[in-house]
Design a protein with these regions (language model features):
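Short sequence motifs at beta-strands and strand-loop junctions characteristic
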Residues: 1, 39-42, 78-82, 125-127
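A generic signature of intrinsically disordered, low-complexity regions enriched in glycine/proline
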Residues: 10, 14, 28, 73, ...
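C-terminal beta-signal and adjacent terminal beta-strands/loops
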Residues: 19, 90-139
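Gram-negative outer-membrane beta-barrel transporters
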Residues: 1-68, 109-112
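Outer-membrane beta-barrel domain signature
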Residues: 8, 32-38, 73-77, 120-124
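Residues on the lipid-exposed face of transmembrane beta-strands in outer-membrane beta-barrel proteins
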Residues: 7-11, 47-51, 60, 86-90, ...
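Short, glycine/charged-rich beta-strand-loop motifs at protein surfaces that mediate ligand recognition
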Residues: 71-78, 85-89, 99
Length: 139
């Protein structure tokens, strides 16, 4: 049996400043033996701020991931962690096509963490601090 909740919201603090939040949680149980289902993610929450003025955006987001210790018999516990993402973007184009260039710094604090859903979490942690330059076209 699976039970869960997911929520996401944005709030305009000013015409140019927005706060966002997200939360998701799943609980899975194999009812026949009353044991936790495998590969169920832990509770995850996040908060962020985004500034936007015309074609420019910048902001940050912190994601909090709880310890996962409600585990299937063959799994190992995964410790909690926090991730900081910073970004800035610029958009241009017209009503037919919009181009967006984004610079994004993921795991800005270089946190050592393991994703509970990773099949190799016991062998290798997730990526440390990394930068991405993204180009997106919408048409």
């Amino acid at each position: 049996m699976l039970q869960g909740i997911e929520a996401h919201g944005d709030v305009a603090l000013t015409p140019q400043l927005f706060a966002e939040f997200q939360l998701d949680y799943v609980r899975g149980t194999l009812k026949a033996v009353n044991e936790p289902l495998p590969r169920i993610p832990p509770l995850r929450t996040g908060v962020g701020l985004r500034w936007q003025r015309n074609a420019l955006q910048a902001g940050g987001h912190v994601r909090f991931v709880a310890t996962q210790d409600r585990i299937f018999s063959t799994e190992t516990k995964t410790e909690d962690y926090r991730l900081l993402r910073l970004f800035a973007s610029y958009s241009f184009g017209d009503s037919n096509m919009t181009h967006t260039i984004t610079g994004r710094l993921d795991n800005a604090t270089n946190e050592l963490y393991r994703n509970h859903l990773s099949l190799i979490k016991d062998l290798a942690p997730e990526a440390g601090r990394n930068f991405r330059l993204l180009y997106n076209v919408r048409f």
